[in-house]
């Protein structure tokens, strides 16, 4: 599974998802990067890479991936919420609020009431 042409397999089937979760952080980052080289528009993989960077404390890399995700998929509401959390952890509260406001707009567009509620709650906490 270390070849890029097989990277897509990690997203197929629960068994492979479990294997992915057992991989080291470095291996997960590598796998996601390889997959995105072949599938740059894949929202799930882009989100996954952003989340891996965020969990690793690599804030700028995470935010770069969230930005790419939201440029390609402006209605991917989880991207706004998790980007806002990443910004807030980095002490960038004003940017986190703006991200949440944009996410709330996306949630309204898509009718995603759960995401709307989560982001509105976080925005209230930050205000």
Language model regions located:
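Structural marker of alpha-solenoid helical repeat scaffolds
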Residues: 38, 72, 89, 106-110
């Amino acid at each position: 599974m270390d070849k890029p042409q097989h990277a897509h397999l990690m997203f197929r089937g629960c068994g492979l998802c479990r294997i992915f979760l057992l991989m080291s952080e470095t291996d997960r980052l590598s796998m996601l990067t390889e997959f995105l080289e072949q599938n740059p528009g894949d929202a799930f993989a882009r989100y996954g890479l952003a989340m891996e960077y965020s969990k690793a404390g690599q804030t700028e890399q995470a935010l770069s991936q969230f930005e790419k995700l939201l440029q390609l998929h402006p209605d991917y509401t989880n991207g706004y919420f998790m980007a806002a959390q990443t910004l807030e952890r980095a002490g960038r509260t004003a940017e986190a609020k703006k991200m949440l406001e944009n996410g709330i707009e996306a949630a309204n567009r898509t009718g995603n009431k759960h995401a709307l509620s989560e982001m509105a709650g976080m925005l209230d906490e930050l205000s």
